[in-house]
């Protein structure tokens, strides 16, 4: 028992030092922040899987206290909110061996709740208004587009028409941030668990089985979510409310990505059953992404008609 506790203390101390280094580098070099968002959760997952979630919590608390002396207490708290808290939830689910959907969705929701709190704290105590910064960048991008059109010698009517389209596109991009963030963080959680599995296998521990591309299965309501998003986007043309546009855009985004994942899984399954090599399958899958809507239709048919099993039955009969 003492040997186990000693090993846990030593590993926690070493991994806590790594967490502090990753976080300090990410706060000093902004473009490395994505790498920090990947490495810190992996460290906490491995620690939780080997010794329990309480050691991961201890590592986060220790790192936050020490980092408060190097940067500031508030910035240390913001790092815990943005990276530490979602990573701890993911580590807890990894240790408890949650099913894949629960393991990906719950930490993502925690991040989406923690991020507005982080924005509010940044605005209140650091005078960092991310909304104003976004609006300024939005206005600057629109101005640059207009200057580009004028330099090309376009007529005023053409410029105004194109600027209207550009403003609508930028506004739609603003609406889709929530849905795109959800998908992006969920995919990041999958990658984190995949890396943690590799480390656990090398360390002789027990990994958490994750479904590969062949086993990806989206819920059937993905089709209805996508169709509802399409219908609501049509209603936005009749009733131009911002809240309706926000809901329609994010329903459409979430449904689209879920159907895209289902379609990729179905295509990979079809190529696998026909004996294509992994290299050729990856090349064909990459080319299929150039026709995203076609892949989404394949995913929709797979959910509604069980396309992959129909093709598997035909191939076995052949």
Regions found by a protein language model. Name each.
Residues 1, 5, 13-16, 241-318:
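Long, positively charged, glycine-interspersed low-complexity recognition regions
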Residues 1-62, 272-282:
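Hydrophobic transmembrane alpha-helices
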Residues 10-15, 80-126:
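Short helix-perturbing small/polar motifs within transmembrane alpha-helices
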Residues 33-92, 302-305:
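Alpha-helical membrane segments and adjacent membrane-interface helices in multi-pass membrane proteins
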Residues 58-65, 104-111, 277-287:
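Central hydrophobic cores of alpha-helical transmembrane segments
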Residues 121-173:
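Membrane-interface interhelical loops and short interface/amphipathic helices
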Residues 151-209:
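Hydrophobic, aromatic-enriched interface-forming segments
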Residues 203-258, 262:
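Small-residue-rich helix-loop
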């Amino acid at each position: 028992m003492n040997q186990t506790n000693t090993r846990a203390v030593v590993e926690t101390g070493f991994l806590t030092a790594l967490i502090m280094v990753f976080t300090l580098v990410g706060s000093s070099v902004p473009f490395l922040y994505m790498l920090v968002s990947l490495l810190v959760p992996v460290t906490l997952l491995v620690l939780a899987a080997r010794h329990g979630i309480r050691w991961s919590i201890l590592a986060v608390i220790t790192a936050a206290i020490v980092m408060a002396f190097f940067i500031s207490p508030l910035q240390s708290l913001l790092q815990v909110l943005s990276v530490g808290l979602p990573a701890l939830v993911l580590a807890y689910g990894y240790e408890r061996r949650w099913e894949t959907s629960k393991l990906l969705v719950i930490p993502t929701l925690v991040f989406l709740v923690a991020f507005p709190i982080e924005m509010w704290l940044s605005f209140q105590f650091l005078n960092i208004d991310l909304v104003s910064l976004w609006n300024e960048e939005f206005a600057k991008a629109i101005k640059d587009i207009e200057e580009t059109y004028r330099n090309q010698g376009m007529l005023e009517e053409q410029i105004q028409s194109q600027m209207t389209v550009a403003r609508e596109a930028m506004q739609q991009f603003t609406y889709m941030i929530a849905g795109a963030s959800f998908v992006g963080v969920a995919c990041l959680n999958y990658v984190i668990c995949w890396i943690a599995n590799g480390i656990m296998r090398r360390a002789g521990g027990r990994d958490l089985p994750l479904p590969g591309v062949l086993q990806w299965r989206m819920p059937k309501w993905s089709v209805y979510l996508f169709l509802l998003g399409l219908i609501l986007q049509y209603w936005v043309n009749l009733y131009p409310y911002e809240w309706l546009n926000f809901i329609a855009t994010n329903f459409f985004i979430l449904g689209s990505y879920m159907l895209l994942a289902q379609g990729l899984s179905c295509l990979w399954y079809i190529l696998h059953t026909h004996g294509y090599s992994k290299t050729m399958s990856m090349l064909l899958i990459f080319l299929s992404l150039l026709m995203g809507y076609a892949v989404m239709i394949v995913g929709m048919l797979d959910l509604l008609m069980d396309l992959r099993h129909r093709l598997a039955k035909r191939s076995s009969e052949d």
